[in-house]
A protein has these predicted regions:
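A short, small-residue-rich loop immediately preceding and capping a beta-strand
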Residues: 5-13
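Amphipathic alpha-helical segments at domain termini/boundaries
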Residues: 39-147
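Short, small-residue-biased leader/transition segments that mark boundaries at the very start
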Residues: 1-3
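Short, well-ordered beta-strand core segments
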Residues: 6, 28-29, 78
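Conserved residues at the C-terminal ends of beta-strands
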Residues: 12, 31, 80-81
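Short, electropositive alpha-helical surface patch
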Residues: 26-28, 32, 93-96
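CoA-thioester-processing core
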Residues: 17-19, 23, 31-50
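Glycine- and other small-residue-rich loops at beta-strand/loop junctions that grip anionic moieties
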Residues: 11, 20, 58
Length: 147
């Protein structure tokens, strides 16, 4: 395991396996309008429906917004954007990111690395855990796959 604290920030659209590698960290923050997934909504729409113009629909189904991923425990924080968006006021956006990083790194630096590693491990063990099996799993378990 990595023996230092790791903090990542998704600034815009992270839509690839390479982007997902940035998520292997102690804390993952996203700008409030950022997207984070293994594939872009446009790419998913192209594959699923052979129609890239359905990217908004794909985005909604994929649940890859900062708010969605905070709910799922993938993201740990959402960094607010200025009223005009991240690119509308770069100074304010930079300040918001800096405040998050300073606060997070200060908190992490107070912890023993063994505790950080255990927390990181626990965080990733919780991602993707569901309390109820899906309808498809229930049908398959009952032997009714064709219903």
């Amino acid at each position: 395991m990595c023996s230092s604290d790791l903090v990542s920030v998704v600034l815009g659209e992270g839509g690839s396996g390479g982007a997902l590698a940035l998520g292997v960290c102690d804390d993952l923050a996203m700008l409030e309008n950022a997207l984070y997934s293994v594939i872009s909504p446009r790419g998913a729409a192209s594959i699923l429906w052979k129609d890239a113009s359905r990217e908004q629909e794909a985005c909604e189904i994929m649940r890859i917004t900062a708010q969605d991923l905070l709910e799922f425990g993938v993201a740990d924080a959402i960094i607010p954007e200025p009223e005009d968006g991240a690119q509308g006021d770069l100074d304010k956006m930079s300040q918001n990111i800096k405040e998050y990083l300073v606060k997070t790194i200060a908190a992490k630096s107070q912890k023993d690395i063994d505790i950080l590693q255990k927390e990181r491990y626990t965080k990733f063990r919780k991602i993707g855990v569901f309390s109820e099996p899906s309808h498809e799993v229930q049908k398959a378990a009952a032997g009714n796959e064709n219903e």
